[in-house]
Amino acid sequence: MSSSSSNDEQDVKDVQITLVDCFADENSREKMTSETRRNARESIMELENARFDALRKDNQFVLVEIFKGKEALSEHKNEPHYKNWNKNVESLMSKPRAKRSYTPVFPTNEDWNRVNTPLQIDENGQQIEVLEGSGTSVACHVTITVHKKDCAAFEKISIENAISSKLEEDGGCLRFDIFKRIFSEADENDENDAAEEYLFAEVFRDSHAQTFHAQTQHSQNWKTKVEPMMAKARTWIQFDQVVFPTDDTMWADGDACEEACEMAW
């Protein structure tokens, strides 16, 4: 193995995927939205950040934070923009925020190491500001609990479905990421001993593209194949608003993920 290959392997970090659930007071939604959008916009500028998305359902905000390694995640919490967000939103929340940790299934850990959120840059090297509300994308999170004995088969079938989704003829599927839940000792229970929890983070160009996806043959086939593998009925949350990114082009995959999709296909 060449020395360059060895260095590449050494540079691959364990990607940290965290979903943070924040619940705003009824009258604080607008302020929470602006503060969270500002924090996300600054967070994607961090060198070792892969994604920082923010979604809203009613008064619940879900932050999807993906960092390249534990050190990058720790450094994020020391950033002035994070500290300002933390201070500014504390009084807006109706209850303490909670977090969930995941490991990547698709794209892979290696792919996430080579991906950053794409930015729109002008000729002067400045980030182009996009008007809030100009995007049309819709997002949903699907939670699926799978019997442990079926996890390998479930992941294979689901990755095939994700790749087919990204290749849909109308190009309406902007993201189809698959994460596997990491439970802490406090979370462990008998159910978790017998099953694993997965989350599909799906983003579509608009509601029509989402409907088109649900009616595709590959989506219907996926449902039929995985139904016997599920420990309980799947659940999902359809978000009311994509808080960030405001520019739909920023949902795009980096080159590494596109290559992975082609190889897997």
Describe the residue ranges of each PLM region.
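Short, well-ordered beta-strand segments in beta-rich or mixed alpha/beta enzyme
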Residues: 15-23, 53-77, 136-145, 177-217
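Glycine-rich beta-strand-turn "strand-cap" elements at beta-sheet edges
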Residues: 2-14, 53-59, 84-136, 174-195, ...
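Flexible, substrate/cofactor-facing loop regions flanked by secondary structure
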Residues: 125-165
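Long tandem-repeat architecture
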Residues: 30-33, 50, 62, 68, ...
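Short amphipathic alpha-helical segments
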Residues: 26-51, 81-84, 150-175, 218-226
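Ordered, small/hydrophobic-rich secondary-structure cores
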Residues: 2, 6-87
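Generic structural motif
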Residues: 25-27, 104-105, 147-149, 207, ...
